[in-house]
Amino acid sequence: MKHPYHIVSLSPDGKTMYAAAARQVDRICLETGECKSTVVEESATRTTTKTGDKPAAAKRTKYLPTSVSHVRSLQLSKGGKYLLATTDETKSLVLLDPTTLEVIKKVQYPKRPSAVATDKEDLNIVLGDKFGDVYGESVEDLLKVEGELKDEPVLGHVSMLTALELGYDSKDRPYVISADRDEHIRISRFPASHVIEQFCFGHQQFVSSLLINDLDASILFSAGGDDEIFVWDWLNGKQLQKLSLREHVESYLNEAHIYVDKKGVATTHKEITVSSLQQIKDTPYLLVNVESTNAIIVLKIVDNKLEVASVFATEAHVISFSVAGNLLVTSEVGSEGVKAYTITDGVVTKSDKEIPFGSCEYEDDSELISLFSTKSLRKRGEF
């Protein structure tokens, strides 16, 4: 049985594609077709528990099933020195060599990682977890850690961390930009992250994507469970724009987007969840995918505002996408291999490039991972 790639990520030059399927990571050279694979996570064995404290309880020992730890995120560090993977059951950050896929270091965190970012020199890594804590460590110190990280977090939110970025001001001073499930975007100094510099308020739903403008580092884009993409002057906490996507994706929404009310009754309203927001490096173009749709929306930055340049229909629902230069790759539902597209002046067309890789083998359903999970961040009222 085959598990599709649930993450695809291109190198900045577009010559290499990294991908994750369940607990496997692949490195595909797009020029030669060579594929290297590594299993980042073995099965995580859960401990057994007894159902009582009497001698006979030994006969009633409850054996919990072995769990499978999946790769939850996969990305190159900003400087390109490391391939970073995070896992769920083992709560780990794994540093891989981008060329060989050799595991350089595996560090276990107290709670499950939910977001990770690096500085531009690859000297520091910040990682947020599902309980809202953010850890900031130098790579040098991480390489010395044995077992679980014991350091204290550098900052904390009251809800799950959903996205992280490291930004810089005009004097090249670093800041942690952190977002959570409670619609908050916080700007904190780094490494003195107890000093909160600013908040960016405006989201009504969770924030799952943060992106600093490659052409102007003072501008931040954010998206998540709202209909809109937000544009910020992040250091001043000023909202510059919010661009609605609804009219552009309405025809692509389906039963997966239907809102079910507190009584469990399906309504006519369909909810939008942005699963990914990426910029084509050194260009004014951004690409957006709304989860569980077969649409890629191309946005253009004009005077620090966004406008829709085009909407492209893919062959099937997009699981994950990545862009580098004029190359766009997508992992799509039911596809035998990764799809390749060409982007020219904001217009997407089908490419002649063939990428036969798009999945890995799995043995049982415990290895399957949810392909469309971003929408689960949306909070529901009590019945």
UniProtKB/Swiss-Prot annotation:
Keywords: Nucleus, Repeat, tRNA processing, WD repeat. It is found in: Nucleus. The keyword Repeat applies. Coiled coil: none annotated. WD repeats lie at residues 66-105, 156-200, 202-244. InterPro entries: Quinoprotein_ADH-like_sf, Trm82, WD40/YVTN_repeat-like_dom_sf, WD40_rpt. Pathway: tRNA modification; N(7)-methylguanine-tRNA biosynthesis. Its main location: nucleus. Transmembrane segments: none annotated. The keyword Transferase does not apply. One of its GO terms (cellular component) is tRNA methyltransferase complex. GO terms for biological process: tRNA (guanine-N7)-methylation; tRNA modification. PANTHER family: TRNA (GUANINE-N(7)-)-METHYLTRANSFERASE NON-CATALYTIC SUBUNIT WDR4, WD40 REPEAT PROTEIN 4. Forms a heterodimer with the catalytic subunit TRM8. Required for the formation of N(7)-methylguanine at position 46 (m7G46) in tRNA. In the complex, it is required to stabilize and induce conformational changes of the catalytic subunit. Belongs to the WD repeat TRM82 family. This is tRNA (guanine-N(7)-)-methyltransferase non-catalytic subunit TRM82.
